[in-house]
Amino acid sequence: MRLSQYYLPTLKEKPAHARIISHQYSLRAGLIKQIASGIYTWLPLGLRVLKNIEGIIRDEMNKSGAIEALMPCVQPASLWRESGRYDDYGKTMLRIRDRHEEDMLFGPTHEEVATDLIRDIVKSYKNLPLCLYQIQWKFRDEVRPRYGVMRGREFLMKDAYSFNVNYESALNSYNLMYKTYIKIFKRMGLIPIGVRADTGLIGGNLSHEFHILASTGESTLYYDNKFFELLESEDVKSLKSIYAVADDIHDPKTCPVPQEQLNVSKGIEIGHIFYFGDKYSKPMNAKVTAQDGKNVNIHMGSYGIGVSRLVGAIIEAFHDDKGITWPEAVAPFRVGLINLQTKTAEYVEIANKIYSTLKSDEVLYDDTEGSIGVKFAKMDLIGLPWQIIVGKKAVSENIIEIKNRATGKVEEVQIEEAINYFNVK
């Protein structure tokens, strides 16, 4: 993509209302633009990051055996009255009345819709286990939206719903999602920690939140320092056996971990999984015939990842004083190609050759006129993993510079060598 033909409205100065670094850089790097409190337009660069995050999530969910669907964002209030949750969300839920005077709502979550989706179709244990997921926009009318996409009112979420015939099978589904989440977040370059947490308005008796450690996090986490030693193994049983809890269930009096072994950190929540048994299937009459011929309530779980929130969380984890330092897996473009002399034919010819030879959908080519300082500052701000710089030696010695954005390391290489490196890697 040529920058001269791209829409990338960056800001030089830090917006006064943006308090945390991810909010500041999201606005300055042209990822988002606010149109109302807690509501944002996703600009082209930010949308590419969202799509890359979605792609990783979709790939790992599909590998787990989950099946993608898409449920409506507008839901009938009757389903929520049936489950008994309609009044639980209070003013957080955006309620709508249509022209037929039917009560509707903009979904803050989809447990009721998911239960309704299968209750008239899935009737036998032979059809289970089943896990359906979607990537869908949701709305919660937060009292104080803040921190940009970290706590917006409209947000993109991956939510999945598992259906099982009994507790043992449901726990297997839960553990599978725990492991899948670890894989998802690690592929994004993150180091996740899964902590036991309160089930809140979703309900149930088993819940884990997934966090990344960050000083700007709103949650306080208590965990055994052995947790991260076991993370590489991705062994769910071992990870779940380690003491790691959110502050809402931590009790200093009963904590089994010695004080010197207990870590206390701030964290940003990026995912949440729940097992809630028949909380929804019972009132909504979602039953199957079990192997013994008896009708039983379906055991359910739900599993959420804040897709749009992850953009902010990743920036919190990957940035420096010049801008974002995207992990390659989620970066909007892999390479930023910078021509320092756009008015000189020899430089333009070399830059165009590099651009046409590389995979153009992975390259943002700065072919604009402007000062060298402005070009470098913009590329550092948007944080593409690699920069290819066409400077003086490109013409005289057939040499260009390759800069690693995260480390700042710069190497001089032959042009063909650089092209081969990025086309093979």
UniProtKB/Swiss-Prot annotation:
Class of this enzyme: ligase
Q: Which UniProt keywords apply?
A: Aminoacyl-tRNA synthetase, ATP-binding, Cytoplasm, Ligase, Nucleotide-binding, Protein biosynthesis
* One GO CC annotation: cytosol
Identify the Gene3D superfamilies for this entry: Anticodon-binding domain, Bira Bifunctional Protein, Domain 2
GO terms (BP aspect): prolyl-tRNA aminoacylation
Molecular function terms from GO: ATP binding; proline-tRNA ligase activity
Spell out the subunit comment: Homodimer.
Which family is this protein grouped under? Belongs to the class-II aminoacyl-tRNA synthetase family. ProS type 2 subfamily.
**This chain belongs to which protein, by name?**
Proline--tRNA ligase
